[in-house]
Amino acid sequence: MSTKVPIYLKRGSRKGKKEKLRDLLSSDMISPPLGDFRHTIHIGSGGGDDMFGDISFLQGKFHLLPGTAVEEAEEDGSFDLPFQFTRTTTVCGRELPDGLSPLLKNAISLPVIGGPQALTLPTAQAPPKPPRLHLESPQPSPQPSPQGAGNVDVWRIPEAGSPHNGMSPEPEAEEPFLSHASSLLSLHVDLGPSILDDVLQIMDHDLGRVQIPT
């Protein structure tokens, strides 16, 4: 707000006319930007027990705070001040030295990410693993111990056509993949006797019409 213009509302010159908002307000009532303005200090009615921020402007004159006056009144036995309540003192459990300015006297700091206090936070449990698909290759079985070497069962993953009854011991070794190669090579296609006869009759009929030049 400009310091040269006094604070007042514009009044209309005509009597009985309804005043509009644009006539009551003026641009002189709007203050210019104040820049980076932040709430960096707070001193409550408790004085020294109810303050935080940079109070170095006091220059060591902490007896001017209302909290110290309340303490002196309690020692004297007289309570003349209207505000007699005080807040709790520091929550960190240690007192600041007298030579330093009490910055953030009763503020609570949040744990730093990755710090020692963050390790005590509860961690979310990992989701359960999905069931293993049948197309995956079976994992190699662990080596049996010498004590249980006498009774060793070979386990395999059931195929898609087999009933889903879990893992079952394999009595024999798996057959090789090329065992049915011979049956695939000996595949014969039978078109049926009726189709073959019709094809042969058409071929013979066409050959009979063809005239061989002499």
Curated annotation (Swiss-Prot):
The entry's keywords: Acetylation, Cell shape, Cytoplasm, Cytoskeleton, Membrane, Phosphoprotein
Positions bearing Phosphoserine: S31, S101, S137, S141, S145
Molecular-function annotations in GO: GTPase activator activity; opioid peptide activity; small GTPase binding
SMART domains for this protein: PBD
Annotated region described as Disordered, given as residue ranges: 119-177
Pfam families per the UniProt record, alphabetical: BORG_CEP, PBD
Keyword Acetylation assigned: yes
Entry's localization field: Endomembrane system; Cytoplasm, Cytoskeleton
In-chain residues carrying the UniProt-annotated modification N-acetylserine: S2
GO cellular component: cytosol; endomembrane system; microtubule cytoskeleton; phagocytic vesicle; plasma membrane
Topology in membrane: Peripheral membrane protein
GO biological process: actin cytoskeleton organization; cellular response to type II interferon; positive regulation of actin filament polymerization; positive regulation of pseudopodium assembly; regulation of cell shape
InterPro entries in the record: Cdc42_effect-like (IPR029273), Cdc42_Effector_BORG/CEP (IPR051296), Cdc42_effector_prot_2 (IPR017363), CRIB_dom (IPR000095)
KW Phosphoprotein (keyword) present: yes
Comment text on domains: The CRIB domain mediates interaction with CDC42.
Self-association and partners: Interacts with CDC42 and RHOQ in a GTP-dependent manner, and with SEPT7.
Function, in words: Probably involved in the organization of the actin cytoskeleton. May act downstream of CDC42 to induce actin filament assembly leading to cell shape changes. Induces pseudopodia formation in fibroblasts in a CDC42-dependent manner.
Similarity-based family: Belongs to the BORG/CEP family.
Protein name according to UniProt: Cdc42 effector protein 2
Natural source organism: Mus musculus
Phylogenetic lineage: Eukaryota, Metazoa, Chordata, Craniata, Vertebrata
